A protein has these predicted regions:
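An aromatic- and histidine-rich active-site surface loop
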Residues: 74-76, 88-108, 115, 120
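A conserved mid-protein helix/loop that constitutes part of the nucleotide-sugar donor-binding site
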Residues: 20, 194-217, 229-232
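N-terminal strand-loop element at the rim of the active site
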Residues: 6-15, 21-70
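A short helix/loop element that forms part of the nucleotide-sugar donor recognition site in Leloir-type
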Residues: 177-191
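A short, active-site helix/loop in glycosyltransferases that binds the activated sugar's phosphate group
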Residues: 138-178
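Short hydrophobic "strand-cap" motifs at the C-terminus of beta-strands
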Residues: 6, 146, 167, 198-200, ...
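A short, histidine- and acid-enriched strand-loop-helix "catalytic/donor-clamping" loop
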Residues: 67, 96-97, 111-126, 139-142
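Nucleotide-activated donor-binding/catalytic signature segment of Leloir-type glycosyltransferases, i.e.
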Residues: 224, 232-244
């Protein structure tokens, strides 16, 4: 079986949670005889094809990005080519331009969509996008939510509950790097043995500003590990809250 994953970002340019989830799926499913491929956008497509963890990654040129939505003039042709050879197309939501490609390609293949996040911040743009979004979600065969709570709390998922299946994210512990004893001792000396740890892309919808507000007046160490569009904003927020 051949599965085509489609999302706006992927390794090696971006190492976020969605990218990790896609990579884990591609890697773990190899044992079941599934040949996974990933199509993504990149500002640098040299080379246009990569091998990562024994699966192929195809990169189309990123031509424009507006409100975290990447656009590409060349990706439609590549999507049609790869989708024609795929048995299943696996979309990763949200990415409004993906909806356009889905309908423009005219590919009649079984489709799965993993619903990673509601659209929270761009509410005005959501009003314009909503008709296309609902049509797109209606057209796919199955929608995957990562938890029962997410299915219950998302008004969008609630509209499509008949086709939603809950499948939690999974991570292979064998893929974890092994830290050196010296590195462990260094960080234990710096932050102690107990602390709150966040690891991931720094994005507005993850509520890290709420975490920083909750930390005021406490002596519990907080470690935020990651990068993303709100990194500078979070650093300023920590300074305003007098968190060092």
């Amino acid at each position: 079986m051949r599965v085509l994953h489609f999302f706006r970002t992927y390794y090696p340019e971006s190492y976020g949670g969605i990218e990790q989830a896609i990579c884990q799926l591609c890697t773990a499913s190899q044992a079941s005889g599934i040949d996974s491929q990933v199509l993504t956008l990149s500002p640098n497509i040299n080379p246009p094809e990569l091998i990562i963890n024994n699966h192929k990654v195809f990169r189309a040129q990123l031509d424009l990005e507006i409100a975290s939505t990447g656009f590409s003039l060349s990706v439609l042709k590549k999507f049609r080519e790869l989708a024609a050879d795929a048995d299943i197309i696996h979309y990763h939501f949200p990415w409004p331009f993906m909806d356009v490609i889905h309908f423009a390609a005219g590919i009649n293949k079984p489709t799965v969509l993993t619903y990673h996040s509601d659209i929270v911040r761009q509410r005005l743009l959501l009003l314009l996008y909503r008709p296309l979004m609902l049509r797109f979600l209606t057209s796919v065969d199955r929608i995957v939510a990562s938890s029962p709570n997410y299915l219950e709390s998302s008004s969008v998922l609630g509209r499509f509950s008949d086709k939603v299946r809950v499948i939690p994210y999974g991570i292979d512990k064998a893929s974890y790097p092994t830290p050196s004893e010296d590195l462990l001792a260094k960080w234990q000396q710096r932050i102690g043995g107990k602390f709150f740890l966040f690891v991931g892309m720094l994005r507005y919808y993850k509520g890290l500003h709420i975490l920083l507000d909750a930390a005021q007046g406490t002596d519990y160490p907080i470690v935020i590990l990651g990068a993303g569009p709100i990194e500078d904003e979070l650093k300023k927020h920590a300074l305003r809250n007098r968190l060092d």
